[in-house]
C-alpha cells in the first residue's frame, strides 16, 4: 500500500537497501525510518538482535528525538546547542546510520567514545531550561488553543488507521489525533494536559527525559559485538514495526520474498498531524507543530 509515493522506489530491492534509502528520506527522521524498516524485516523473519545492538539503536533513536525536539523549539528559544548534542549522540550508528543492519549494529563504539557521549549527555542536561514550561503556560493563558487527542506507538493498531486524499492525512479510529512529544510525555506521566500549547512544554521535558535515558543505556554497554548474522528464509513473509521517532510515530510494513522487497508501506506522525492542523487552522498551531513537509509530501 503506497501512502506517500516514496515506497514505490523500494520494490524489487534487496533488504540491504533499506537503511541507506531510509536515512535519505527525511533528515529529521533518518534514524527512525531506517530503524523501523530494519525492524520490520526482523519481525518478518523472527530475527533476534543482541542486547548490545538494541542498546545502541535505542541510544541513537533517543538522540534523534533530542535533536528534533530542539529543532522544533527554535521558533521560541535558542536550542541550537541541544540540537547539536542530539545529532552527535545519534551518530553512534555511524554517519547516516551506516552501521545499522538487519541483525543488529555492525560496529560498536569505543570505551573512550562511550565516556565522551556520557559527558555530552550530561552537558545537555545542564542546557535544559526548567523555566520554559512556565513561559508556555503564560502564553497559553493569553492565546487559547484546543486540546487534542493523542496517539503513540505503544498503543498503535494499523487496522484503525484511515487515510484520505493525496498526499494522505490520517485519522485513528475515526478521530483526529496528535502524534509526537506530547503523546509520549503524557504517557510517561510527565505532563497532564493535552492542550496544543503543551506540545512546546513536552519537547523541553522530553529532552531531559531522553538525555537521562541515554546516560542509563550508555552505562549498560559492555562494548561486546552488537550484531548477529541473520538467517533469511525462502518464501514470502510480512513484517511490521512501529516506533516513536524524532517527530512521532513511524510505521513500516514490508512484504518480502526472501531478500527481495515486494511491497512497502510507510506511515508517519505527519500524516496524523496534518489532520490536526487542518482541523485547527491556526497560525500559532502551525508554529507549534511545525509539520515536517518532507515526511508528509514525499
UniProtKB/Swiss-Prot annotation:
Disulfide bonds: none annotated. GO terms for molecular function: nickel cation binding. InterPro entries: Ni-dep_hyd_lsu (IPR001501), NiFe-Hase_large (IPR029014). This is Uncharacterized protein MJ0727. The lineage of its organism: Archaea, Methanobacteriati, Methanobacteriota, Methanomada group, Methanococci. Signal peptide: none annotated. It comes from the Archaea.
Amino acid at each position: 500500500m503506497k501512502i506517500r509515493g516514496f515506497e514505490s522506489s523500494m520494490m524489487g530491492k534487496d533488504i540491504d537497501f533499506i537503511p541507506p534509502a531510509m536515512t535519505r528520506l527525511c533528515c529529521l527522521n533518518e534514524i527512525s525510518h531506517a530503524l523501523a524498516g530494519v525492524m520490520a524485516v526482523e519481525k518478518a523473519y523472527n530475527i533476534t538482535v543482541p542486547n548490545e545492538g538494541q542498546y545502541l539503536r535505542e541510544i541513537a533513536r533517543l538522540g534523534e528525538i533530542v535533536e528534533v525536539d530542539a529543532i522544533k523549539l527554535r521558533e521560541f528559544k535558542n536550542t541550537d546547542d541541544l540540537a547539536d548534542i542530539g545529532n552527535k549522540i545519534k551518530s553512534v550508528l555511524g554517519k547516516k546510520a551506516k552501521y545499522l543492519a538487519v541483525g543488529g549494529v555492525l560496529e560498536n563504539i569505543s570505551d573512550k567514545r562511550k565516556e565522551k557521549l556520557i559527558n555530552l549527555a550530561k552537558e545537555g542536561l545542564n542546557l535544559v531550561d526548567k523555566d520554559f514550561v512556565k513561559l508556555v503556560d503564560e502564553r497559553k493563558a493569553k492565546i487559547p488553543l484546543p486540546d487534542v487527542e493523542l496517539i503513540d506507538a505503544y498503543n498503535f493498531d494499523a487496522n484503525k488507521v484511515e487515510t484520505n486524499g493525496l498526499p494522505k492525512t490520517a485519522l485513528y479510529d475515526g478521530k483526529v489525533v496528535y502524534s509526537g512529544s506530547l503523546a509520549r510525555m503524557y504517557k510517561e506521566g510527565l505532563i497532564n494536559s493535552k492542550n496544543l500549547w503543551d506540545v512546546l512544554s513536552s519537547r523541553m521535558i522530553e529532552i531531559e527525559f531522553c538525555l537521562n535515558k541515554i546516560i542509563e543505556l550508555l552505562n549498560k554497554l559492555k562494548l561486546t559485538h552488537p550484531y548477529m548474522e541473520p538467517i533469511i528464509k525462502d518464501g514470502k513473509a510480512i513484517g511490521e514495526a512501529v516506533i516513536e521517532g524524532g517527530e512521532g510515530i513511524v510505521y513500516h510494513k514490508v512484504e518480502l520474498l526472501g531478500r527481495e522487497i515486494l511491497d512497502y508501506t510507510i506511515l508517519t506522525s505527519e500524516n496524523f498531524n496534518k489532520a490536526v492542523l487542518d482541523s485547527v487552522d491556526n497560525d500559532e498551531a502551525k508554529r507549534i507543530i511545525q509539520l515536517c513537509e518532507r515526511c508528509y509530501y514525499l
